[in-house]
Swiss-Prot record:
Residue spans of biased composition, Low complexity class: 320-360, 377-390, 403-450, 501-540, 568-590, 600-640, 677-690, 698-719, 754-763
Region entry 69 X 10 AA tandem repeats of Y-[KRQ]-[PSTAHQR]-K-[AIPTSKGV]-[STR]-Y-[PTSVA]-[PSTQA]-[STYIPAQ], spans: 124-871
Annotated spans, Nonapeptide 1: 184-192
Function: Provides adhesiveness to the mussel's foot. Mussels produce one of the strongest water insoluble glues. The mussel's adhesive is a bundle of threads, called a byssus, formed by a fibrous collagenous core coated with adhesive proteins.
Keyword Amino-acid biosynthesis carried by entry: no
Region (Disordered): 273-781
Protein name: Adhesive plaque matrix protein
Annotated segments matching region Nonrepetitive linker: 21-41
Subcellular location: Secreted
Biased composition (Pro residues): 273-282, 291-302, 361-372, 391-402, 451-462, 471-482, 541-552, 641-652
């Protein structure tokens, strides 16, 4: 620990140059600082002893001399020898066994016992001090080869001799394209042949593909494009920049709006004869009927006041950005008002037929009959979003590379191919819910149909008295070696017999519920009609429990060590279990009027929701407190010595009573609310209004007698060793627990068709639908020609001695491999500053900045006698 502390001190000394925290450090001629046991922080040199075993110097040169080592030259001593720079004080631990450089001899002991030492300096070499920022350049002997160290994250890029040809390496996912010699004859490689399995019509297969198959991307389920009757007119939706016009009465045909760059052709009602639109510079020559009164012409900045027929009711005016289209009576054909820069077109009476003139570049659009509804035109980049009726299921859009999955008619039955390792799962009727598979150690929780009435579990020694239904014909008992003869219905068509290890599962008509076939050592159970509810059979040592009428709810029995897991209704909030010393904080419903708190020995039973009837476990001496519905107002009982205190309304301020020794404080004005000061032992007596119903306080030993409502059903109290039977709500269906040796026989719904279990050597005979065309069976030596999908690129097989030339993608940068004797030339990042290590005998030659003034060096014969002040 001492060494660690001193090393931390050294770190502080080296870093805090500006504070000159160098006290307690001794400087040697090389510029290293050693203090206390800090020599353990340095690496030992070759040939030296480990720290603490022998006084052998451990030295590591410092390349940078910190500022604090520029010693101060003011001493209180009368004699100030040149070249000696003692510190003003020492660290508390100074004087411990310390390692110094070879020429250094310690000069100080503990302060209290200090005696001056006559110190000699052989061949004194000047100690050099540098400015704080100076980094001296180290020179090395010509033969020195530095060992370079790198940062941990540095990944070196090796260099190679000119003649080196690297062996290329590739990423793990790279699949090389193999080239072959011209004389190579490709031998196709096939997967082991396995006939295609066929399945009943209701089987929905999981399709698998060969390893090289490039799977089509999976998309959201395909929804076909809805087809509409010829008269269907879709409602078009527009991009976000579209500003829809207000909706009008059915007879109004709206003016369409388009993207900003669109110049629309205005559509008009059927009776309107259109006026041409011209460029802004076009001035038409207007002709009028004899009765027309011309409208005066105005300067360009004039904002015309629109004139309307006498029956027109004008709409309010809006701010400039708003372009209001006024509504007019049916016979009026009006143009809208526009911003100031717009040159308005003249308005004419309804019967006016203008002579239209066009600019030379104008291409007229054809005129249509009155019933024609024009098709909207959009900018070239506009892609309309079509809206559909609520029942429309859109067809999804796919990327260009999407290859659609073929759709088939509902009656299509696909023929599925599987990989060699595929193990077919038995097919079930559509209503069948598959049985989950679990690890070998899994003990299943048996699930029953809603009508299932569980039978209790018994200890292993229980012998049951078996009861059967009136129609039950008992199965005779056979010796263990008996192999039962399977019975079939009259319509059964027997399948061919198989070798001994195989037991064929008979096929039955659809209504028949057959039992599975088992290995030879299995004692088969009898098969029953679907409506039969089997009686569970038990081992010979089992003692049966009598059967009860359907309305009987059995009391579950458990082994002596069984601790039942209590099940509560969904609304139940469980009470946490606490250590015996826990004092629970009681929570109440919102309408609950709390009873008074009790002294420490009393353990309060929390109240639960109204529907929950819970039995809490208490010590034997405890008399349980009843729980009430939220609206119950308890009648409080008191001991005979109780004197009730009156209760008061909320606005009542009680008159405080004081003990005889109380000295009242002076009275204050009404606004002042004074808190009385009382002696420490004072307990004020509260006064209450007449309507107050007091809460009783009891002595510590008082056990309250609780009164209950008439509908309350008390639960008995039990001794501490009693393990109570859990009470459940009426709808609770208990989970039956069985002894460890009990193997449960699962019960299934009437429609369940069991999955047969076979011997390990059993190979099932596949059943095929009527449309199945079987593939021929081949001899073991037959190698079929494999058919692949169109996109399949076969991977050829080669002779064992063939070494393919691998082709790589253009962006691949190979990682070369080298001969074992190759020593790469290491390259470094530009910012890397190597940490240089030196041989043990190397003494660096120090170089100095131009402004450096060396301190005086002394001849070898100089032996200064150092005297220290008395406070040392």
């Amino acid at each position: 620990m001492e060494g660690i502390k001193l090393n931390l001190c050294l770190l502080c000394i080296f870093s805090c140059d500006i504070f000159a925290l160098s006290n307690g450090n001794i400087h040697n001629v090389y510029g290293s600082a050693y203090s206390g046991a800090s020599a353990g922080a340095y690496k030992t040199l070759p040939g030296s002893h480990p720290y603490g075993s022998k006084h052998v110097p451990v030295y590591k040169p410092m390349n940078k001399i910190p500022t604090p080592y520029i010693s101060k030259k003011s001493y209180p001593a009368p004699y100030k020898p040149k070249g000696y720079y003692p510190t003003k004080r020492y660290q508390p631990t100074y004087g411990s066994k310390t390692n110094y450089p070879p020429i250094y001899k310690p000069i100080a002991k503990k302060l209290s016992s200090y005696k001056a030492i006559k110190t000699t300096y052989p061949a004194y070499k000047a100690k050099t001090s540098y400015p704080p920022s100076y980094k001296h350049k180290i020179t090395y002997p010509p033969t020195y080869k530095p060992k370079i160290t790198y940062p941990p994250t540095y990944k070196q890029k090796p260099s190679y001799p000119p003649s080196y040809k690297p062996k290329t390496t590739y990423p793990p996912t790279y699949k090389p394209k193999i080239t072959y010699p011209p004389t190579y004859k490709r031998k196709p490689s096939y997967t082991p042949y396995k006939p295609k399995a066929t399945y009943p019509p209701t089987y929905k297969p999981k399709i698998t593909y060969p390893p090289t198959y490039k799977r089509k991307p999976s998309y959201t389920p395909y929804k076909p494009k809805t087809t509409y009757p010829p008269t269907y007119k879709p409602k078009i939706s527009y991009p976000s920049i579209y500003k829809p016009k207000a909706s009008y009465v059915s007879s109004y045909k709206s003016k369409k709006t388009y993207p900003p760059t669109y110049k629309p052709k205005i559509s008009y009602p059927p009776t309107y004869k259109p006026k041409p639109s011209y460029p802004p510079t076009y001035k038409p020559k207007v002709t009028y009927p004899p009765t027309y009164k011309p409208k005066p012409s105005y300067p360009p900045t004039y904002k015309p006041k629109i004139t309307y027929p006498p029956t027109y009711k004008p709409k309010p005016s809006y701010p400039t950005p708003y372009k209001q289209k006024p509504s007019y009576p049916p016979i009026y054909k009006s143009k809208s008002s526009y911003p100031t820069s717009y040159k308005s077109k003249k308005t004419y009476p309804p019967t006016y037929k203008p002579k239209i003139t066009y600019p030379p570049t104008y291409k007229p659009k054809p005129s249509y009959p009155p019933s024609y509804k024009p098709k909207k035109t959009y900018s070239p980049t506009y892609k309309p979003k079509i809206t559909y009726p609520p029942t429309y299921k859109p067809k999804p859009s796919y990327p260009p590379s999407y290859k659609p999955k073929t759709t088939y008619p509902p009656t299509y039955k696909p023929k599925i191919s599987y990989p060699p390792t595929y193990k077919p799962k038995a097919s079930y009727v559509s209503s069948y819910k598959s049985k989950k598979t679990y690890p070998p150690t899994y003990k299943p929780k048996i699930s029953y149909p809603p009508t299932y009435k569980p039978k209790p579990s018994y200890p292993p020694t229980y012998k049951p008295k078996i009861t059967y239904p009136p129609t039950y014909k008992p199965k005779p008992s056979y010796p263990p070696t008996y192999k039962p003869k399977i019975t079939y219905p009259p319509t059964y068509k027997r399948k061919p017999s198989y070798p001994t290890p195989y037991k064929q599962k008979p096929s039955y008509p659809p209504i028949y519920k057959s039992k599975s076939s088992y290995p030879t050592s299995y004692k088969s159970k009898k098969t029953y009609p679907p409506t039969y509810k089997p009686k569970i059979t038990y081992p010979p040592t089992y003692k049966p429990k009598p059967s009860y009428p359907p309305s009987y709810k059995p009391k579950t029995t458990y082994p002596p060590t069984y601790k039942p897991k209590i099940r509560y209704p969904p609304t139940y909030k469980p009470k946490a279990s606490y250590p015996p010393t826990y004092k629970p904080k009681i929570t109440y419903p919102p309408t609950y009027k709390p009873k008074p708190s009790y002294p420490t020995p009393y353990k309060q039973k929390p109240s639960y929701p109204p529907i929950y009837k819970s039995k809490s476990s208490y010590p034997t001496a405890y008399k349980s407190k009843k729980t009430y519905p939220p609206t119950y107002k308890p009648k409080i009982t008191y001991p005979p010595t109780y004197k009730p205190k009156p209760s008061y309304p909320p606005s009542y301020r009680p008159k405080i009573t004081y003990p005889p020794t109380y000295k009242p404080k002076k009275s204050y004005p009404q606004a002042y609310k004074s808190k009385g000061s009382y002696p420490p032992s004072y307990q004020p007596k509260k006064t209450y209004p007449p309507s107050y119903k007091p809460k009783k306080t009891y002595p510590p030993t008082y056990k309250p007698k609780i009164s209950y409502p008439p509908t309350y059903k008390t639960k008995p109290s039990y001794p501490a060793s009693y393990k109570r039977k859990t009470s459940y709500p009426p709808t609770y269906k208990p989970k039956i627990s069985y002894p460890s040796t009990y193997k449960a026989k699962p019960s299934y719904p009437p429609t369940y068709k069991p999955k047969p279990s076979y011997a390990s050597s059993y190979k099932p005979k596949i059943r095929y639908p009527p449309t199945y065309k079987p593939k021929p069976s081949y001899a073991s030596s037959y190698k079929p020609k494999i058919r692949y999908p169109p996109t399949y690129k076969p991977k050829p097989s080669y002779a064992s001695s063939y070494k393919p030339k691998i082709r790589y993608p253009p962006t691949y940068k190979p990682k070369p491999s080298y001969a074992s004797s190759y020593k790469p030339k290491i390259t470094y990042p530009p910012t890397y500053k190597p940490k240089i290590s030196y041989p043990p005998t190397y003494k660096p030659k120090i170089t100095y900045p131009p402004t450096y003034k060396p301190k005086i060096s002394y001849p070898p014969a100089y032996k200064p006698k150092i005297s220290y002040p008395s406070q040392y």
